[in-house]
Amino acid sequence: MRSDGVLVRSTAAPLPRCATIDGAHLVVVSPHLDDGVLSCGQLLAARRSAFVVTVMAGVPAECQPPSEWDRRSGFGSAPTAIRARRYEDAVALSSLDAGWLWLEYLDAQYDWGRPTVIELADALDGAVPQEAELLGPLGLREDDHQLTGAAFEEVAQRRLRRGQRCAVYADEPYHRLDRGASARARLRELREHGLRATRRRSANPTGRRAAKARALAAYRSQIGALACSYGPAALGRLGPESIWTLQLADDDA
């Protein structure tokens, strides 16, 4: 702890080792370092050769001051915060036998120049093996989630036209904060854009719930701030997760 009372977290431990994304059968697109596990941890626990691609995982410049969220999480600098969160993400995903890929876009809280939807879609489409099932966020409420959701929608349109598999998940904790209203609105919007979403029946075995809970516990720097901001819902849905399979609406004809 520094003399001014700010906790400085150490990330000196080496990162767990990670396989390459080339052999992944399932790839989950995550806006931030924790969103994939918050929303899809049970699915990740159930699937072999799963990977999480986190979009806003770039490390800010050393001169970047901490955001209010960083301060609430106990960090004295922005790059220290992101390096610690990367380490936590690697530990969490390793516990689920999942791999990870961190893109270098900065979190919106650092007041960065945002990519366009097409730029981000191109990056995602190029990073993910064509044979993998791609699962992305609806893109609910928060700026980074909305940008990631819009880019994923563009990628899904492309991949479905190529005969590839895509699905979408409800972003937690935002999905439950309004009892699913924003998710229902977003699903209607996807339908208007030519994508039909079919809810998956989700098994909810105790072992997968326990695996997700253990993975969430790895995000030590995030748990306190999440709970203070959003209440118990922030710690992730341990009931059935909300996932929809996507197909082109014109396939109904």
For the regions a language model picked out, list residue spans one by one.
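Active-site beta-strand->loop->alpha-helix modules in alpha/beta enzyme cores, enriched
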Residues: M1-R158
